[in-house]
Curated annotation (Swiss-Prot):
Gene source species: Solanum commersonii
Signal peptide boundaries: 1-21
Classification lineage: Eukaryota, Viridiplantae, Streptophyta, Embryophyta, Tracheophyta
UniProt record similarity statement: Belongs to the thaumatin family.
InterPro entries the record matches: Osmotin/thaumatin-like_sf (IPR037176), Thaumatin (IPR001938), Thaumatin_CS (IPR017949)
Name used for this protein in its record: Osmotin-like protein OSML15
Domain of life: Eukaryota
Length: 250
């Protein structure tokens, strides 16, 4: 077999393996405004107009991974700039986590018992309604979930910031809200989020009702910003002003 033929066979096998493996993530923007999607440690960042999608593949073993949306961004041709919510160090291609407030889709693939673990979290606050889950649902807690309440419009005054609703830990700090020194429970402020998004993490130890699992290798995943039926589907229902134009090139 020639070297060229060997390379071609290797490429075809790799392509078939990739296209048949789970772990493909689609990030779709259904909001009536531009969202600058972000994903770490796999993905980076992408500008999404309404109706646009972005796909990337996360390999088995990926963990502590996040997907979120950024709003009111301005980036130059080199991908440097700033976002009002979810900013990740002033770059389009995120390498680190975003600045609160930002609604999060979190996941870890192919962990113990060959399970994928995933969730929606508002521990870092809320900026955009979101749905997240498997494209091929399975038994138990392997089904899509969402957080679509009008949290920005109803946000307590102590947590309200431009473009979103901040989290109590960032705002006030301390064990009560941050749970950094041992067990902790819900607070009145975390209950504000939980009552509106019962499937989402509302404080760091909100595991029993907020962690979802799917069997590894059985499904891909989809994140949607402003899923159908959410309060942000139409501009008139979005409670915080969005810009009519931006300056970035992305």
């Amino acid at each position: 077999m020639s070297h060229l033929t060997t390379c071609l066979v290797f490429f075809l096998l790799a392509f078939v393996t990739y296209t048949n493996a789970s772990g493909v993530f689609e990030v779709h923007n259904n909001c009536p405004y531009t969202v600058w999607a972000a994903a770490t440690p796999i993905g980076g960042g992408r500008r999404l107009e309404r109706g646009q999608s972005w796909w990337f593949w996360a390999p088995p073993g990926t963990k502590m991974a996040r997907i979120w949306g950024r709003t009111n961004c301005n980036f130059d041709g080199a991908g440097r700039g700033w976002c009002q919510t979810g900013d990740c160090g002033g770059v389009l291609e995120c390498k680190g986590w975003g600045k609160p407030p930002n609604t999060l889709a979190e996941y870890a693939l192919n962990q113990f018992s060959n399970l994928d673990f995933w969730d929606i979290s508002v521990i870092d606050g809320f900026n955009i309604p979101m749905s997240f889950g498997p494209t091929n649902p399975g038994p138990g807690k392997c089904h899509p979930i969402q957080c679509v309440a009008n949290i920005n419009g109803e946000c307590p005054g102590s947590l309200r910031v431009p473009g979103g609703c901040n989290n109590p830990c960032t705002t006030f700090g301390g064990q009560q809200y941050c749970c950094t020194q041992g067990p902790c429970g819900p607070t009145d402020l975390s209950r504000f989020f939980k009552q509106r998004c019962p499937d989402a993490y509302s404080y760091p130890q909100d595991d029993p009702t907020s962690t979802f699992t799917c069997q590894s290798w059985t499904t891909d995943y989809k994140v949607m910003f402003c899923p159908y039926g959410s309060t942000h589907n139409e501009t008139t229902n979005f409670p915080l002003e969005m810009p009519t134009s931006t300056l970035e090139v992305a």
